[in-house]
Amino acid sequence: SYSMEHFRWGKPVGKKRRPVKVYPNGAEDESAEAFPLEF
């Protein structure tokens, strides 16, 4: 499910995912995948 969202929010959410990684939650997994998309 997040696959399609990544492509859609990969750019706008990419910036918000960076700070989200600070959370000890599973957000790190989401931010880690958003990084390669932007990089």
Swiss-Prot record:
One Gene Ontology cellular component annotation held by this UniProt entry: extracellular space
Molecular function per GO: G protein-coupled receptor binding; hormone activity
Positions carrying N-acetylserine: S1
Lineage top rank: taxon: Eukaryota
Compartments where found: Secreted
Alphabetic keyword roster: Acetylation, Amidation, Cleavage on pair of basic residues, Hormone, Phosphoprotein, Secreted
GO terms of biological process kind: regulation of corticosterone secretion
Broad class of the protein's primary localization: secreted
Residue ranges the record marks as coiled coil: none
Residue numbers bearing the Phosphoserine modification: S31
Pfam assignment, any one: ACTH_domain
Modified residues (Valine amide): V13
Family listed: Belongs to the POMC family.
Function statement: Precursor protein for pituitary hormones that regulate stress and environmental adaptation.
Protein name, UniProt field: Pro-opiomelanocortin
Organism: Balaenoptera borealis (Sei whale)
Lineage: Eukaryota, Metazoa, Chordata, Craniata, Vertebrata
